[in-house]
A protein has these predicted regions:
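Active-site pocket-lining/capping segments in soluble small-molecule metabolic enzymes
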Residues: 12-13, 138-167, 177-182, 224-282, ...
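N-terminal amphipathic alpha-helix/helix-capping segment at the start of soluble metabolic enzymes
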Residues: 2-39, 43, 51, 159-171, ...
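Glycine-rich anion/phosphate-binding loops
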Residues: 97-115
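Short, low-complexity, charge-dense intrinsically disordered segments
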Residues: 324-334
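Conserved, mostly hydrophobic/aromatic
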Residues: 37, 63, 112, 195, ...
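Glycine-rich, positively charged N-terminal anion/phosphate-binding segment
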Residues: 17-23, 47-55, 71-89
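Active-site mouth loops of central-metabolism enzymes
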Residues: 33-48, 69, 91-103, 172-187, ...
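Active-site-adjacent beta->alpha loops and helix N-cap segments on the catalytic face
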Residues: 45-47, 71-83, 101-107, 127-147, ...
Length: 339
């Protein structure tokens, strides 16, 4: 463990701003950050995206545009980011290695940066067999770690993987996913260390429903000094019922839901309300854990619940976040830069 920690002294990834994006500014200021997932529509109507984004923007520092999560096809992450940047929102482009090779991915990074996307989350991606088109041909030319390294090289060295020069490199804030709640547990902090070494500057975790397990994980993360090398946002989300929780635990890989949580739901008169309250309670405990920099809220097809959960948790106390505030701040920054 000490040897791993020592290797990070040469990688001060948190020194100095990388992008001009809101998420990085909030994290570097020491404020507790909030991100959330926009579940992409099965539609070509931009209003379907804008309606969801408007709800999330009231409480979020950045909005994740998922990239065919679960290997199911929806509007692309790139398309959603194009819409969100045009409307003045701060998106997180998710890139899954499942569907595109290194040539396409590097081109997407440049295109996204040119549109004003400042945040990229690098993912290996779910296997095609988990989705509704299992006959699709998987690519996996890169994985999440090699993708992080590739984009970092584009940004910091202004070069493609081929070695060819990039005239204007992308100024992107790099993120990755982590799952503290799946075995082998001892290996999870070491996996995080490898992603940070590859270039990850922020981390969004899988759903957390077990605070004690998170505390143990963060204890090792702090011992390794990894919390000083990246910003960790812990995944949370409401459970609709005890039945839904049992189904998720049995069918969604990597999601750990303790018996005590399911029993609490099962014993509630209004299980949906209790699921929201459990999420709020978890956020209140998560914010007290040293080394945690924020939360990442995932509420599938329930964006309206995100605002209620975040507001009731109190983590945005004394902070005002909405679309108009973000646009005003952006106009002020642009005017300052010009002057």
């Amino acid at each position: 463990m000490n040897e791993v920690a020592a290797n990070f002294s040469a990688h001060p990834v948190l020194e100095g701003d990388i992008s001009t994006g809101r998420l990085e500014r909030v994290l570097r200021s020491g404020r507790f950050a909030v991100t959330a997932e926009l579940n992409p529509p099965d539609s070509a109507d931009p209003e379907d995206t804008f309606r969801q984004a408007l709800v999330l923007s009231q409480v979020c520092d950045a909005i994740n545009a998922t990239d065919a999560s679960g290997a199911n096809c929806h509007m692309s992450s790139m398309g959603i980011c194009a819409l969100l940047t045009r409307a003045g929102y701060s998106p997180v482009l998710q890139i899954s290695c499942r569907d595109r090779n290194r040539i396409a991915i590097q081109g997407d990074v440049l295109g996204a940066a040119a549109m004003g996307v400042h945040n990229i989350l690098c993912l290996t991606g779910d296997g095609v067999e988990t989705g509704d088109q299992p006959g699709a041909k998987p690519v996996f030319d890169l994985d999440s770690t090699t993708l992080l390294s590739a984009i970092r090289g584009m940004r910091d060295d202004a070069r493609f993987l081929s070695g060819r020069r990039i005239s204007t490199p992308p100024d992107v804030f790099l993120g990755a996913a982590a799952n503290p709640f799946a075995p082998p547990y001892d290996w999870r902090p070491l996996r995080l260390a490898k992603k940070i070494e590859a270039g990850a500057q922020f981390i969004q975790t899988q759903y957390c429903y077990d605070i004690e397990m998170l505390r143990r994980y963060m204890g090792v993360v702090r011992d390794l000094g990894l919390d000083e090398k990246c910003f960790i946002l812990v995944g949370v989300g409401p459970l609709a019922s005890a039945k839904a929780a049992r189904w998720i635990r049995a069918n969604v890989p990597g999601v750990h839901i303790p018996d005590a949580v399911i029993e609490r739901l099962a014993g509630a008169r209004d299980q949906k309300h209790e699921g929201k309250q459990i999420c709020i309670d978890l956020i209140e405990e998560i914010r007290e854990i040293k080394g945690v920099s924020g939360v990442h809220v995932m509420a599938y097809r329930q964006e309206h619940l995100v605002t209620e959960i975040i507001q009731k948790s109190g983590i945005l106390k004394n902070r005002i976040i909405n679309a108009e505030t973000a646009r005003s701040a952006r106009r002020t920054e642009e005017a300052t830069a010009v002057s």
